[in-house]
Amino acid sequence: MELTHIEDGKVRMVDVSHKDDVDRIAVAEGYIRLRSSTIEAIINKEVAKGNVIAAANIAGVMAVKKTPELIPMCHPIPITSVKFDFDIESVGIRVKCTVKSKGKTGVEMEALTGVSVALLTIWDMVKSLEKDERGNYPKTLIEVIRVVEKVKGGKE
């Protein structure tokens, strides 16, 4: 198996100039486990820092757009759409990020980065509610961040 980002032992950005611009879609998701009392505070908009879902949505969109600044070999590509879905459950929140582009390379890293930052923002917004008496987070857990769908030029 050839590693595309390594040549002669040196890390490099892959040349995609020969590729055609095609429609690209990637969907990533992740989950954050929270105390049920924290979930209630989010639903009732009683979190001191403000609207948790709105903040996570904005942070996630910003992260998608900044992905090439965070991941060294990630190409800067034209993002045409970013959409977040937040599914609030009794013990946590599932975050899904759909990213679209018309370009030479996929948008999986952008979708993964968006989900990751949205989840981290949720944690930051509710950390005062999640801490135990020692300042730890025994119930808070971010898990299963993954790409659930990738489409290139209409082909899954």
From Swiss-Prot:
Catalyzes the conversion of (8S)-3',8-cyclo-7,8-dihydroguanosine 5'-triphosphate to cyclic pyranopterin monophosphate (cPMP). Homohexamer; trimer of dimers. Substrate binds at M73, C74, H75, M109, E110. Keywords: Lyase, Molybdenum cofactor biosynthesis. It holds the Pfam family MoaC. This is Probable cyclic pyranopterin monophosphate synthase. Its EC number is 4.6.1.17. It catalyses: (8S)-3',8-cyclo-7,8-dihydroguanosine 5'-triphosphate = cyclic pyranopterin phosphate + diphosphate. One of its GO terms (biological process) is Mo-molybdopterin cofactor biosynthetic process. PANTHER family: MOLYBDOPTERIN COFACTOR SYNTHESIS PROTEIN A. It comes from Archaeoglobus fulgidus (strain ATCC 49558 / DSM 4304 / JCM 9628 / NBRC 100126 / VC-16).
